[in-house]
Amino acid sequence: MTSAYELVSDYQPAGDQPQAIKTLNEGLENGLAHQTLLGVTGSGKTFTLANVIAKSGRPTVIMAHNKTLAAQLYGEMKAFFPNNAVEYFVSYFDYYQPEAYVPTTDTFIEKDSSVNEHIEQMRLSATKALLERKDAIIIASVSAIYGLGDPQAYLSMMLHLSRGDIINQRDILRRLAELQYKRNDMAFERGTFRVRGEVLDVFPAESEHEAIRIELFDDEVERISKFDPLTGSIITKDMPRCTIYPKTHYVTPREKVLDAIEQIKVDLAERKKELLANNKLVEEQRISQRTQFDIEMMNELGFCSGIENYSRYLSGRPQGEAPPTLFDYLPKDGLLIIDESHITVSQIGAMYKGDRSRKENLVEYGFRLPSALDNRPMRFDEFEARAPQTIYVSATPGKYEIEKSGSDIAEQLVRPTGLLDPIIEVRPVGTQVDDLLSEIRIRTKVGERVLVTTLTKRMSEDLTEYLAEHGVKVRYLHSDIDTVERVEIIRDLRLGKFDVLVGINLLREGLDMPEVSLVAILDADKEGFLRSERSLIQAIGRAARNLEGKAILYADRITGSMEKAIGETERRREKQILHNEALGIVPTALKKNVADILELGDMTKNKRKIVAPKMKLSEVAEEGASYQSMTPQQLEKEVQRLEAKMYQHARDLEFEQAAKVRDEVEKLRNQFITNS
């Protein structure tokens, strides 16, 4: 069977990669529900996964435990599959304050949120790709387990038009209004339509650069074409048909809304009786007033503020049933890959409990009907039941993944570059600080970097101060530092602006720094979460991308976790040495551009190239640097400002300037994903 995917890479699988790819693909073909890819740091796990996806030819969801890792994966997969649908599905809130009630102070906090339009467009594009294409790869965060609109209602609301259809223009306009598109004959933006005589232009909600033009002759669809909404130039002429998707995942047919209102009225009457029976008069009045207002809004407008709390009625689900999520859009033969599974799996399980306790307060005190409890993320058992065939990916898989996979674990211990796992030394705690200082001096002389991990914030601060007093260029990475600043600190370490980075639990997953040749773990014998076998292996792995990689564990005794971590690292190192000797491989240093950790690859590869006037290199560099230091909120404001400028240029028929500004907006949007 020919795969729908086209993998583009200058490399061929090497080291343990061919065997891992073969094992995982055979497992998928044999119908294995759970497999694990145990891949050491720097062994090219992403490339292995790209090969597995390409060979299997299945639509795939890759889940990451945070937006930073999701953005990194998105960039890498975009580079591997430039001609396929690689999409990004993370939470679209720039800011989110859920509604809550604090009984002790009698304080009700209204829901407040700010939705990022670009991420919303990418989410719509992701579900569209899953519904339309076999070659869809969706990079998602844990927000994938939260409720999304019912796919059946979403599909039933789509507007299909074919050349030669007999349909009245007013009927098309009514259908577009039902899909929550707005008419705007002045500013043509995403999620709007405009009418000029018998020509109807629609800017689809999931599209970035393409709009649809429907030309009618009387009541017949005469021509359908695709055009650039900015310049007006035709992209595809005379299309046989087109499909317009709803503006939001939560769109619902009018009949369903009316049915839901009737059911809400019945449940409201029951809840009022219940509250009165318990002598809760204030709560009874509160639930009555709030729900009646919502019913009125739904009746008049088709939606209301907080309509997600009535999602059970709108999707026709029985009480307690799991909400529809991204997994309901994934075809039956879909594939799920969970990256850094030892963290992501536990995150999936934790989401439900926190949401539940907040909602129970709202229901108990009459702010919401009990149906609000069904607007929630999936429980872990529901996630397990809905998840398709799954591959867990980690250098240190958790108990859950190992139990589920059993013997179906593909090991990727050998790196294509021949690099070995670090040498591990155990040294006494008594002299750890002075010993560390002398080790730092040895490394900095040859231009290498050092990571130091401590147990407490206080110790990190004191150590940073001590090292700085002794002339070491050192920085401290702590939990108060936001994602953007964190990325900048890592970049500065790689560039050599400082030599030593001190932290607590921040030097683990997803940090690729080939310049780091030494990882020092202070108080390694203090058994606990930060010094568990998994944490130690992850920290040791940070030195695995350097030819001179070494890890020093400062401890007065060997704990169980240390013994396991040292044993596992030595087992891997032994296998790597044997492999190198057998094939005559000489380990080579990993070359990774410093820019790689800040950029998402060429996301605009397949988009129109517009030649802009030459700029001075210094100007370009300054511009890029200023974008990197912006917060997501600042970037969003800048995008809005530039978009307004772009549309003004288009209205003034200055298409070259408009296209130039559009390229700038594209850069900002890519940076937004990294910075968020």
Curated annotation (Swiss-Prot):
Subunit structure: Forms a heterotetramer with UvrA during the search for lesions. Interacts with UvrC in an incision complex.
Alphabetized Pfam families for the sequence: Helicase_C (PF00271), ResIII (PF04851), UVR (PF02151), UvrB (PF12344), UvrB_inter (PF17757)
Record PANTHER family: UVRABC SYSTEM PROTEIN B (PTHR24029:SF0)
Description of its domains: The beta-hairpin motif is involved in DNA binding.
Residues in Helicase C-terminal domain copies: 432-594
Role according to the record: The UvrABC repair system catalyzes the recognition and processing of DNA lesions. A damage recognition complex composed of 2 UvrA and 2 UvrB subunits scans DNA for abnormalities. Upon binding of the UvrA(2)B(2) complex to a putative damaged site, the DNA wraps around one UvrB monomer. DNA wrap is dependent on ATP binding by UvrB and probably causes local melting of the DNA helix, facilitating insertion of UvrB beta-hairpin between the DNA strands. Then UvrB probes one DNA strand for the presence of a lesion.
Beta-hairpin (motif): residue ranges: 92-115
Annotated UVR domain residues: 636-671
Keyword vocabulary terms for this entry: ATP-binding, Cytoplasm, DNA damage, DNA excision, DNA repair, Excision nuclease, Helicase, Hydrolase, Nucleotide-binding, SOS response
Gene Ontology molecular functions: ATP binding; ATP hydrolysis activity; DNA binding; excinuclease ABC activity; helicase activity
InterPro entries cross-referenced by the UniProt entry: Helicase/UvrB_N, Helicase_ATP-bd, Helicase_C-like, P-loop_NTPase, UVR_dom, UVR_dom_sf, UvrB, UvrB_inter
Family: Belongs to the UvrB family.
Residues the record lists as binding ATP: 39-46
An example Gene Ontology biological process: SOS response
Subcellular location: Cytoplasm
The protein, known as: UvrABC system protein B
Gene transcribed to yield this protein: uvrB
GO cellular component, one term: cytoplasm
Major site of localization recorded for this protein: cytoplasm
